[in-house]
């Protein structure tokens, strides 16, 4: 009989097996199936007998076994079919199902409330990858469903039976592959799964569906949706089912599915499908699971956190996010006051908050709304010659002989530092200490909190044009062609460095060596302790205006249009960087990347290890006049110009992003003299030389929620 059933099943599979589509469990397909049930319920009851009669007719030609086993088996199948139909029509079963749905709805509301914050965080990241995956999934389902009807005869394509079964039937996947993990928010367990006895582990390969449930930590016994009494003969039919071979069981299941209504098929899908969604992460030790998640990009990690509660706990791991922050150069966690009480089991990650905040800040720099900046008015119509910005404190120096201390938060002038008898042309700041150099040939050390002048440093015989502060010492360069090393705590001059024959224009100090550039075309490297010149770097053919020093390389910019890279140990010139057409007025060096601004209105990005020009910031949006100041970080380059604009560029691509500041008087006298930027704020010193723009500071804040 088994072989005969197999032959009949093969025949049915050739004629009707391909009718089985692959209905999705999505909401659209569920509504479609429910609509079919509601509209055709009466018609299905009438067609039920016709379908059974048609199936019985196909088996008529099969030779029955002795003892009427064929008739008995057919009766049991009909009895079980009627039992599945009666379950869906049972009112008490529907009522219990409704109560269970209400209970799950309450649990879902609570879970949604817990995950609301995670959803908001994820929405801040680009969702294009998810959209493309959904499109690909939709296309794959469409191709699969289309291919399943290629070999159908014409009369079956047009039959009502085909229309009905393609909506309600699902072809079983008997392969060994496990379903891919879904994107839904489904709770998953984490434990060392054991068998129902609790004594021995489950087998590595589950042999029954109950074993599979046990392997998933859910127990072999499912919670039933109805309390109706089992039909007569059910246990005998199950015993007979267990006695059949694997192919015979598959054939019986196919026959059973053919006789089910859409709601019954839907129930089977809801029971079976989740068991093949194995959560491999929850089966791993926590340390190994975190190691796996560490390979995800931050935006993908936020998406993974929405998969289930256990994944969310893993995705909140503070050390995991600390590594992500380290990769992005974020060196401090973010400690904020929580408005919501965190439920047990969920630990807030300060490092994750810091990463999300930094992502929001970067987005605001790129495309956030440019709200009206804070305007800090001062120094009347004088030129702001130097600008410092540290923490929440801004210090501006002017040729009106004063310095002003401002709050970057409120925009208020906290105090005015009065004492110089000439214009202030250089300054440095660290913590609460401010140092200024003036045309009155002195340096002054100020207390930023009180405005008190702590020391006045005498020694230079001309304007103090440049200085560099390192810890407790400051090195000053003067138009008297000398450099002096000072102790800012005692006010004493420790060393005098003499050797230049013209005004010193720029200086750098790393605590061990002093590097100076002067109008005598020379760059000198000094040992301040012995007051000796270690190297004189010769090569420029005009005045040296700018310097950078990272402890290994010296980079000098000159009026001769060239930039030279030197080895500080040997004094050799490693590279000569050419491309600019005029004076290199400003440079910044970080991690072998040099950004130079020039009076020819261009900005260039260089690799000083190779001497290669990586990018030239120009094009239709380039500056229209000399570049006055610049600053860069790992993502952006910020430049200011005599044309009255401040521009933002992409460091890696060199592409223009947008204008951050555009003066109305730009092009007719309005100038941006200096800029200083932190991670979250931009400070610009603006004014004019012809009275068209009032002297002031502009403060833009990018650490705000632009939504």
From Swiss-Prot:
Impact after mutating residue 544 to G: In DEDHIL; no effect on protein abundance; changed on proteasome-mediated ubiquitin-dependent protein catabolic process
Effect upon mutating residue 372 to A: Does not affect interaction with PIN1
Modification after translation, per record: Phosphorylation at Thr-205 promotes interaction with PIN1, leading to disrupt FBXW7 dimerization and promoting FBXW7 autoubiquitination and degradation. Phosphorylated by ATM at Ser-26 in response to DNA damage, promoting recruitment to DNA damage sites and 'Lys-63'-linked ubiquitination of phosphorylated XRCC4. Ubiquitinated: autoubiquitinates following phosphorylation at Thr-205 and subsequent interaction with PIN1. Ubiquitination leads to its proteasomal degradation.
Effect of residue 117 to K: In a breast cancer sample; somatic mutation
GO biological process: cellular response to UV; DNA damage response; DNA repair; lipid homeostasis; negative regulation of gene expression; negative regulation of hepatocyte proliferation; negative regulation of Notch signaling pathway; negative regulation of osteoclast development
WD repeat segments: 378-418, 420-456, 459-498, 500-536, 539-578, 580-618, 622-659
Residue list for modification Phosphothreonine: 205
Composition-biased stretches (Basic and acidic residues): 130-139
Gene Ontology molecular function: cyclin binding; identical protein binding; phosphothreonine residue binding; protein-macromolecule adaptor activity; ubiquitin binding; ubiquitin protein ligase binding; ubiquitin-like ligase-substrate adaptor activity; ubiquitin-protein transferase activator activity
One Pfam family named in its UniProt record: F-box-like
Domain of life: Eukaryota
Biased composition (Polar residues): 69-84
Phosphoserine: residues carrying this PTM: 26, 227
Effect of mutating residue 505 to L: In an ovarian cancer cell line
Annotated keywords: Biological rhythms, Chromosome, Cytoplasm, Disease variant, DNA damage, DNA repair, Host-virus interaction, Intellectual disability, Nucleus, Phosphoprotein, Repeat, Ubl conjugation, Ubl conjugation pathway, WD repeat
Pathway(s): Protein modification; protein ubiquitination
Annotated segments matching region Disordered: 1-151
Compositionally biased intervals (Acidic residues): 87-129
F-box domain segment(s): 278-324
Assembly with partners or alone: Homodimer; homodimerization plays a role in substrate binding and/or ubiquitination and degradation. Component of the SCF(FBXW7) complex consisting of CUL1, RBX1, SKP1 and FBXW7. Interacts (via F-box domain) with SKP1. Interacts (via F-box domain) with pseudophosphatase STYX; the interaction is direct and prevents FBXW7 interaction with SKP1. Interacts with cyclin-E (CCNE1 or CCNE2). Interacts with PSEN1. Forms a trimeric complex with NOTCH1 and SGK1. Interacts with NOTCH1 intracellular domain/NICD and NOTCH4 intracellular domain/NICD. Interacts with NOTCH2 intracellular domain (N2ICD). (Microbial infection) Interacts (via WD repeats) with SV40 large T antigen (via CPD region).
Function: Substrate recognition component of a SCF (SKP1-CUL1-F-box protein) E3 ubiquitin-protein ligase complex which mediates the ubiquitination and subsequent proteasomal degradation of target proteins. Recognizes and binds phosphorylated sites/phosphodegrons within target proteins and thereafter brings them to the SCF complex for ubiquitination. Identified substrates include cyclin-E (CCNE1 or CCNE2), DISC1, JUN, MYC, NOTCH1 released notch intracellular domain (NICD), NFE2L1, NOTCH2, MCL1, MLST8, RICTOR, and probably PSEN1.
Domain notes: The WD repeats mediate interaction with substrates of the SCF (SKP1-CUL1-F-box protein) E3 ubiquitin-protein ligase complex.
PANTHER family given in the database record: F-BOX_WD REPEAT-CONTAINING PROTEIN 7 (PTHR19849:SF1), PHOSPHOLIPASE A-2-ACTIVATING PROTEIN (PTHR19849)
Disease: Developmental delay, hypotonia, and impaired language: An autosomal dominant neurodevelopmental disorder characterized by global developmental delay, borderline to severe intellectual disability, language difficulties, hypotonia, and gastrointestinal problems. Brain imaging shows variable structural abnormalities affecting the cerebellum, corpus collosum, and white matter.
Protein name: F-box/WD repeat-containing protein 7
Protein source organism: Homo sapiens (Human)
């Amino acid at each position: 009989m088994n072989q005969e059933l197999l032959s009949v099943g093969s025949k049915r599979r050739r004629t009707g097996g391909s009718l089985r589509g692959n209905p999705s469990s999505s909401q659209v397909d569920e509504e479609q199936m429910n609509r079919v049930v509601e509209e055709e319920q009466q018609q299905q009851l009438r067609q039920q007998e016709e379908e059974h009669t048609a199936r019985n007719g196909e088996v008529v030609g099969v030779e029955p076994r002795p003892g009427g086993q064929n008739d008995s088996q057919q009766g049991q199948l009909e009895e079980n079919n009627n039992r599945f139909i009666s379950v869906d029509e049972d009112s008490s079963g529907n009522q219990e199902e409704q109560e269970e749905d209400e209970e799950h709805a309450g649990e879902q509301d609570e879970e949604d409330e817990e995950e609301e914050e995670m959803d908001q965080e994820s929405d801040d990241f680009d969702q294009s990858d998810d959209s493309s995956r959904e499109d690909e999934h939709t296309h794959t389902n469409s191709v699969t469903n289309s291919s399943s009807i290629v070999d159908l005869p014409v009369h079956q394509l047009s039959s009502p039976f085909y229309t009905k079964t393609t909506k309600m039937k699902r072809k079983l996947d008997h392969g060994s592959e496990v379903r891919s993990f879904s994107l839904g928010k489904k709770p998953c367990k984490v434990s060392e799964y054991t068998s129902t006895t609790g004594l021995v582990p489950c087998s590595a390969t589950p042999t029954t569906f109950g074993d599979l449930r046990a392997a998933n930590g859910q127990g072999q016994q499912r919670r039933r949706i109805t309390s109706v009494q089992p039909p007569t003969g059910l246990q005998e039919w199950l015993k007979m089912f267990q006695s059949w071979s694997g192919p015979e069981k598959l054939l019986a299941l196919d026959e059973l599915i053919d006789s089910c209504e859409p709601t019954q098929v839907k129930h089977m899908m809801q029971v079976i499908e989740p068991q093949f969604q194995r959560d491999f992460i929850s089966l791993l030790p926590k340390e190994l699971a975190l190691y796996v998640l560490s390979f995800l990009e931050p935006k993908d990690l936020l998406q993974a956190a929405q998969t289930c509660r256990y994944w969310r706990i893993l995705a909140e791991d503070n050390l995991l996010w600390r590594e992500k922050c380290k990769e992005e150069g974020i060196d401090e966690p973010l400690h904020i006051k929580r408005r919501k009480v965190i439920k047990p089991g969920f630990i807030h990650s300060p490092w994750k908050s810091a990463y999300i905040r930094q992502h929001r800040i970067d987005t605001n720099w790129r495309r956030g709304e440019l709200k009206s900046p804070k305007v800090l008015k001062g120094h009347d119509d004088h030129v702001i010659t130097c600008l410092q910005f540290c923490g929440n404190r801004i210090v501006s120096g002017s040729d009106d002989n004063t310095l002003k201390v401002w709050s970057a938060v409120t925009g208020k002038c906290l105090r005015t530092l009065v004492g110089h008898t000439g214009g202030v042309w250089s300054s440095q700041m660290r913590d609460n200490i401010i140092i200024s150099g003036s045309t009155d040939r002195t340096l002054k050390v100020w207390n930023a909190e009180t405005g008190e002048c702590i020391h006045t440093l005498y020694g230079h015989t001309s304007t103090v044009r440049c200085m560099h502060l390192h810890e407790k010492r400051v090195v000053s360069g003067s138009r008297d062609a000398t450099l002096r090393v000072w102790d800012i705590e005692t006010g004493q001059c420790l060393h005098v460095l003499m050797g230049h024959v013209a005004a010193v224009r720029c200086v750098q100090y790393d605590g061990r060596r002093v590097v100076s550039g002067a109008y005598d075309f020379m760059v000198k490297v000094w040992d301040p302790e012995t007051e000796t010149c270690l190297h004189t770097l010769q090569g420029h053919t005009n005045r040296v205006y700018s310097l950078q020093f990272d402890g290994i390389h010296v980079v000098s910019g000159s009026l001769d249009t060239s930039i030279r890279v030197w080895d500080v140990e040997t004094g050799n010139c490693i590279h000569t960087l050419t491309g600019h057409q005029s004076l290199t007025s400003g440079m910044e060096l970080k991690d072998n990347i040099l950004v130079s601004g020039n009076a020819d209105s261009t900005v260039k990005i260089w690799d000083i290890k190779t001497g290669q020009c990586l990018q030239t910031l120009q094009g239709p949006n380039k500056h229209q006049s000399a570049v006055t100041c610049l600053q860069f970080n790992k993502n952006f380059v910020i430049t200011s110009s005599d044309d009255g604009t401040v521009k933002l560029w992409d460091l890696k691509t060199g592409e223009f992003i947008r204008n951050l500041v555009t003066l109305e008087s730009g092009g007719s006298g309005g100038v941006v003299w200096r800029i200083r930027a932190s991670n979250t704020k931009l400070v610009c010193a603006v004014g004019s030389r012809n009275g068209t723009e009032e002297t002031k500071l502009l403060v833009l804040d990018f650490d705000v929620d632009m939504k």
